[in-house]
Amino acid sequence: MIVRMIRLCKGPKLLRSQFASASALYSTKSLFKPPMYQKAEINLIIPHRKHFLLRSIRLQSDIAQGKKSTKPTLKLSNANSKSSGFKDIKRLFVLSKPESKYIGLALLLILISSSVSMAVPSVIGKLLDLASESDGEDEEGSKSNKLYGFTKKQFFTALGAVFIIGAVANASRIIILKVTGERLVARLRTRTMKAALDQDATFLDTNRVGDLISRLSSDASIVAKSVTQNVSDGTRAIIQGFVGFGMMSFLSWKLTCVMMILAPPLGAMALIYGRKIRNLSRQLQTSVGGLTKVAEEQLNATRTIQAYGGEKNEVRRYAKEVRNVFHIGLKEAVTSGLFFGSTGLVGNTAMLSLLLVGTSMIQSGSMTVGELSSFMMYAVYTGSSLFGLSSFYSELMKGAGAAARVFELNDRKPLIRPTIGKDPVSLAQKPIVFKNVSFTYPTRPKHQIFKDLNITIKPGEHVCAVGPSGSGKSTIASLLLRYYDVNSGSIEFGDEDIRNFNLRKYRRLIGYVQQEPLLFNGTILDNILYCIPPEIAEQDDRIRRAIGKANCTKFLANFPDGLQTMVGARGAQLSGGQKQRIALARAFLLDPAVLILDEATSALDSQSEEIVAKNLQRRVERGFTTISIAHRLSTIKHSTRVIVLGKHGSVVETGSFRDLIAIPNSELNALLAEQQDEEGKGGVIDLDNSVAREV
C-alpha cells in the first residue's frame, strides 16, 4: 500500500533523491565523490528520511521491447533456470562502464604489484645459486658480493624500494576497487528501486517484499563484487599465470610439459563447477528473499502474533525457511568442497611430479638447485593462478545468477506506464463518469467485481459509496487512481479517458486517505508535508489551518515536541485516530479538486469526525468533489449523495441520505438494519474494519 501512496504525488522522484541522486551516482568526475542526497525543497522540515516498505516482486510481464503483453505471467523465472549466464555477464560489464577508468587504473596497479611478486622467485633462485657457488670459492675469488651487477647493499636497497612500490600499488588497488564497488552498488540499487516503484499494482500485489529487499541488498552487492573485486582477482590470476608459465618455460621446458599435462582436467572441473555454482547461487538468493519476506511479515505483525499466542507457530515457520536456505547453502558447500578438494589433489600431484623429475635433473647436472627452487615457486604461482581463475569463474557465475534476478526486475516494463500521456491541466469542475465499466482483479480473474457499472459524479458532490463487504467500494478508489485498468468500458473526467493522462501528474491532482494510513519514519510535520509542493509547504498559515481542519491541534499540544514528534516506523508511536488525522491534515493542506476517503474517519472520535465533516462540507460549497467509502452512519449522513452497491458490484440505488433513509425497504435501510442487528448480538461485525491490516 505504501507504494500507492508514493505514487499519488512526487513519491518516485522523492524516493530516488532520498535513495541516491542519479546525477551524482552516474557521475565519475571524482572517484571519492559519494552519491549525493537531494534535500527536499521545503524550508519547514528536515530532509525526508523515509523507510519504504514495498510489497515485493514476483510478477514478470511478457512485455518485450516496449510491446504490451496481453497475458503477463505472475512469477519471475525459476530459480533453477539453466539459461546461459553470459548475456548477464556482458550486462554486468556494461553496467560498470561509468567506472571503467577507475577499474582500468586498478588493473594497471595490479600489473605493477604482480610484477613485483613475480620477480621474487627469480631473485630467490639467484641467491641460492650464488650461495652454493660461494661455498666452493675462496674469499678473494668470490663473486657472491655481486647480484645482477649490484653490490649486496645496492641490490637489497633497490629490492626494498621495489617491494614498497608493490605494496603501495596493491593498497591503492584495493581502495580504488572498494570505492568503485560501492558506487556500482549504489547505482544498481537506485535503478532497481526506481524499477520497483514504476511497476503496476498487479505486479506489486502478487509479489513479496522480502524478495525485493533481497534484490536490493545482497543481490546488488554480489553483482558489484563480481565486476570489481572479482575482476581484479581474475586479472591478477591471469598475469601470474602467463608470467609464471613464461618463466617456467624459460627455466625448463621439460618440467613445464609435466606441469601442463594436468591443466586440462583443472579447466574441465572449473567449467562444470562454475555452471553448478551459478544455479545454486540463484537458488540461494531466491531462498534468502523468501526468508526475508517471512521475517518482514512476522516483525510487522508482532502484536497480532503475541495476541493470539502464535509465537511457536511463527518460529517454526521461520525455521522452515532457514532450513531451506541451509540446505541450499549445504549443497553449495559440498560442491565447493569437492571442487577445491579435487583441484588441490591435482595440484599436489603435479608438485610431487615436478620434484621427482626436478631432483633427477639436478643429479644429472642439467639444472641447478636455484633454478629448481625458482621453477617450483613459479609453478606454485601458476597453480595458484589456475585456482584463482577457477574461483574467478565461479564468482562470475554467482554474479550472473544474482544479476539475472536484478536485471529481471529492471527490464520488466509495467503494464500501466506512469509517464506516458498528456498532462491533465485540472480536474476541477469536471464530472467523473464510470461508463460501462467491467473489472476483475488480475490475481483473481474468475471473480467479477464490476460488470457494466455506470456511475456519474457531478462536480462539487460529496458522494458516499456503501455496500456489503466485497461489493467493490474500495475498488472504485483503486480504479480512479488507476492502480488497475478496467477490462472494458472507461473512466472519464469530463470527456477525457483517464488512460490518456500522464499517470504520475494525474495522481498529483487527487487526494487520497486510507483507513490505515501508512506514515513514514520521521516527524509529524514530515508526514503532513509529504510530497506537498514547496510553494504550499512554505505557507505556515496554510499548514496551521490544515492541522485545525483535521483536529490535530489538541493532541499535538500534548506532545512536548509538537510537530517535531517522531512517529516511529510506520507510525507505530501514534494511535489509529492520530494517524488518520495526520493523513487528513496532509489532504486538507494539498486541497485537491478531487479527494478520496477510504474509511478515512473510522478511527476518529465523534468530535473529530464532526470537525472533519464540516470541512468536507465547505469543500462541497467551493465546488470540490469528495468520494467517501464508508460503513459508519455518521459518515454516510454527511454526504450529499449515497451510492449503494450490491454484492456483485452493481449500483442498486442512489440518492441523498434523507431520501433513501425515508424509504422503509431501501437497500440503505437494509444495510443499516443489518448493522443494528449485529450490534444487538454483541457489537458491530464489520469485516472490512475488524481485520487488522498489517500490510
Curated annotation (Swiss-Prot):
Effect annotated for changing S575N: Decreased release of long peptides from mitochondria
Membrane topology: Multi-pass membrane protein
UniProt keyword terms in alphabetical order: ATP-binding, Membrane, Mitochondrion, Mitochondrion inner membrane, Nucleotide-binding, Transit peptide, Transmembrane, Transmembrane helix, Transport
Keyword Transmembrane: yes
SUPFAM superfamilies referenced in this protein's UniProt entry, alphabetically: ABC transporter transmembrane region, P-loop containing nucleoside triphosphate hydrolases
Chain's role: Mediates export of peptides with molecular masses of 2100 to 600 daltons generated upon proteolysis of mitochondrial inner membrane proteins.
Other comments on record: Present with 1040 molecules/cell in log phase SD medium.
Protein name: ATP-dependent permease MDL1, mitochondrial
Organism: Saccharomyces cerevisiae (strain ATCC 204508 / S288c)
